[in-house]
Amino acid sequence: MEKVLVTGGAGYIGSHTVLELLEAGYSPVVIDNFHNAIRGEDSMPESLRRVQELTGRSVEFEEMDILDQAALQHLFKKHSFKAVIHFAGLKAVGESVQKPLDYYRVNLTGTIQLLEIMRAHGVKNLVFSSSATVYGNPQYLPLDEAHPTGGCTNPYGKSKFFIEEMIRDLCRADTAWNAVLLRYFNPIGAHASGRIGEDPQGIPNNLMPYVSQVAIGRREALNVFGDDYATEDGTGVRDYIHVVDLAKGHIAALKKLKEQCGCRTYNLGTGTGYSVLQMVQAMEKASGKKIPYKVVARREGDVAACYANPSLAHEELGWTAALGLDRMCEDLWRWQKQNPSGFGAQA
């Protein structure tokens, strides 16, 4: 069984990907520093404890920070990894504007150290979590992989763009490297069991966890940031993708690495954009609850509309998002209902 290192594997996308790795017969080794994960029994992240329960397989986990070089060295000596899936990093757009150095230190330095240690141990296969934020303000829609990158509107997006460039340069300099850069659009939803899902710490930065917390009664009302965008109903349009589809994209990416693919970049999205108000409606339908909202000022750095052309991933990875909006909302609602306080308190 192939050993794959998953950094940041206890988080939202990471934990769903670890589950898919197990289902696909890989042997994942997970590191995480609990920045975005809840500690369960035996110092195991609660998300991964539940992944073990769902799959009946055990997950090897070590608490570790990607900035801790000595610990990473030790890990790579102990295991012989075939590939690395790199999720670890800071990810809140708004916070990145306030704390740019934190974002550059963790995301850039952390990745550089990881790449150096991979190189030293001859592990030259990488899947990287990038983001549609690398496109900046869309010059045209839908966004394909040829759309210019780098006009990012915040340090989070810039950090993802810089890392993409770094990996690209590395693959150019040494053709033994293979990397797949996955540009995520907006992952939502949860595993169909309702046992794992997104559990933001504090006030959610993303729309759907906030909406579902309003539906369950944890929050009063949703703030809609601007209704004067040049979109059909004036609210921001995004490409929402089911987290399970997204996780499966990482399995397809690992297979691609085996073809000695060099550096490849793919959008992971559905190709369909939905507005904030359409998402509120869809969530009202799934939950049977009314979701009160109020319109407030636009948020700095937000673009009017952003959605993918996902056809390259379909052609080259054989991957397509299969789960639609209703399913995303139903699964999100099941998770929220079964875990009203997330992983922290057992429902």
Curated annotation (Swiss-Prot):
<comment type="similarity">
    <text>Belongs to the NAD(P)-dependent epimerase/dehydratase family.</text>
</comment>
<keyword id="KW-0520">NAD</keyword>
<dbReference type="GO" id="GO:0033499">
    <property type="term" value="P:galactose catabolic process via UDP-galactose, Leloir pathway"/>
</dbReference>
<dbReference type="GO" id="GO:0003978">
    <property type="term" value="F:UDP-glucose 4-epimerase activity"/>
</dbReference>
<feature type="binding site">
    <location>
        <begin position="184"/>
        <end position="186"/>
    </location>
    <ligand>
        <name>substrate</name>
    </ligand>
</feature>
<dbReference type="GO" id="GO:0042803">
    <property type="term" value="F:protein homodimerization activity"/>
</dbReference>
<feature type="binding site">
    <location>
        <begin position="11"/>
        <end position="13"/>
    </location>
    <ligand>
        <name>NAD(+)</name>
    </ligand>
</feature>
<feature type="binding site">
    <location>
        <begin position="223"/>
        <end position="225"/>
    </location>
    <ligand>
        <name>substrate</name>
    </ligand>
</feature>
<feature type="binding site">
    <location>
        <position position="184"/>
    </location>
    <ligand>
        <name>NAD(+)</name>
    </ligand>
</feature>
<feature type="binding site">
    <location>
        <begin position="65"/>
        <end position="66"/>
    </location>
    <ligand>
        <name>NAD(+)</name>
    </ligand>
</feature>
<feature type="binding site">
    <location>
        <position position="238"/>
    </location>
    <ligand>
        <name>substrate</name>
    </ligand>
</feature>
<dbReference type="InterPro" id="IPR005886">
    <property type="entry name" value="UDP_G4E"/>
</dbReference>
<feature type="active site" description="Proton acceptor">
    <location>
        <position position="156"/>
    </location>
</feature>
<comment type="function">
    <text>Catalyzes two distinct but analogous reactions: the reversible epimerization of UDP-glucose to UDP-galactose and the reversible epimerization of UDP-N-acetylglucosamine to UDP-N-acetylgalactosamine. The reaction with UDP-Gal plays a critical role in the Leloir pathway of galactose catabolism in which galactose is converted to the glycolytic intermediate glucose 6-phosphate. It contributes to the catabolism of dietary galactose and enables the endogenous biosynthesis of both UDP-Gal and UDP-GalNAc when exogenous sources are limited.</text>
</comment>
<feature type="binding site">
    <location>
        <position position="87"/>
    </location>
    <ligand>
        <name>NAD(+)</name>
    </ligand>
</feature>
<feature type="binding site">
    <location>
        <position position="160"/>
    </location>
    <ligand>
        <name>NAD(+)</name>
    </ligand>
</feature>
<dbReference type="GO" id="GO:0003974">
    <property type="term" value="F:UDP-N-acetylglucosamine 4-epimerase activity"/>
</dbReference>
<keyword id="KW-0119">Carbohydrate metabolism</keyword>
<dbReference type="GO" id="GO:0061623">
    <property type="term" value="P:glycolytic process from galactose"/>
</dbReference>
<dbReference type="GO" id="GO:0006012">
    <property type="term" value="P:galactose metabolic process"/>
</dbReference>
<feature type="binding site">
    <location>
        <begin position="131"/>
        <end position="133"/>
    </location>
    <ligand>
        <name>substrate</name>
    </ligand>
</feature>
<keyword id="KW-0413">Isomerase</keyword>
<protein>
    <recommendedName>
        <fullName>UDP-glucose 4-epimerase</fullName>
        <ecNumber>5.1.3.2</ecNumber>
        <ecNumber>5.1.3.7</ecNumber>
    </recommendedName>
</protein>
<comment type="subunit">
    <text>Homodimer.</text>
</comment>
<dbReference type="Pfam" id="PF16363">
    <property type="entry name" value="GDP_Man_Dehyd"/>
</dbReference>
<feature type="binding site">
    <location>
        <begin position="32"/>
        <end position="36"/>
    </location>
    <ligand>
        <name>NAD(+)</name>
    </ligand>
</feature>
<feature type="binding site">
    <location>
        <position position="91"/>
    </location>
    <ligand>
        <name>NAD(+)</name>
    </ligand>
</feature>
<dbReference type="InterPro" id="IPR016040">
    <property type="entry name" value="NAD(P)-bd_dom"/>
</dbReference>
<keyword id="KW-0299">Galactose metabolism</keyword>
<dbReference type="InterPro" id="IPR036291">
    <property type="entry name" value="NAD(P)-bd_dom_sf"/>
</dbReference>
<feature type="binding site">
    <location>
        <begin position="205"/>
        <end position="207"/>
    </location>
    <ligand>
        <name>substrate</name>
    </ligand>
</feature>
<feature type="binding site">
    <location>
        <begin position="299"/>
        <end position="302"/>
    </location>
    <ligand>
        <name>substrate</name>
    </ligand>
</feature>
<comment type="pathway">
    <text>Carbohydrate metabolism; galactose metabolism.</text>
</comment>
